[in-house]
Design a protein with these regions (language model features):
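Nuclease catalytic cores that cleave nucleic-acid phosphodiester bonds
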Residues: 2-150
Length: 150
């Protein structure tokens, strides 16, 4: 069975790049978004869920099949997807794996504790073309690995 690509599309800067690559390899793309981020893109199916804490995440997890590719920057969602045998990339092309997810979840927890105590943590920088290029390269490599294309 061909993998599908599921995108946690709320605030995702690489939706268009994902659709272009998926089309090249004949893969289906599904965008999962909540009502605050309604989007429709040619070449992708869009599922819109009610706005609410993690409702898009739970919908995405319910759609995941072993071997699917998921695009998200959410560590909690990534952990759930890993347990179902999915492959996860973030918007910068970094892979979330069983080997690195615990450390990522711990750093998220520490950051939350700092913010809760009144501290500040560094926010994201302005997105660059290099980040987009790195994502496209990583997604294509992952697709080729899964489809066993040399």
């Amino acid at each position: 069975m061909m993998p599908q690509i599921l995108v946690d599309a709320d605030g995702c800067p690489v939706v268009d790049e994902t659709i272009v690559l998926a089309k090249r390899y004949g893969l289906e793309v599904t965008l999962i978004t909540d009502t605050a981020h309604v989007m429709n893109r040619e070449g992708a199916t869009t599922i819109t869920v009610e706005k609410g804490s993690d409702s898009a995440d739970f919908r995405l997890v319910n759609l995941v099949r072993k071997g699917d590719i998921i695009i998200t920057q959410d560590y909690g969602l990534a952990a759930m997807v890993l347990s179902k045998g999915g492959h996860i990339l973030n918007q910068n092309g970094s892979r979330y794996t069983n080997e690195n997810i615990d450390g990522l979840l711990m750093s998220r927890h520490i950051g939350k504790k700092i913010r809760r105590a009144g501290g500040r943590t560094k926010g994201p920088s302005k997105r660059t073309k290099e980040q987009d290029d790195r994502f496209v390269y990583a997604l294509e490599a992952l697709i080729q690995e899964i489809l066993q294309i040399n």
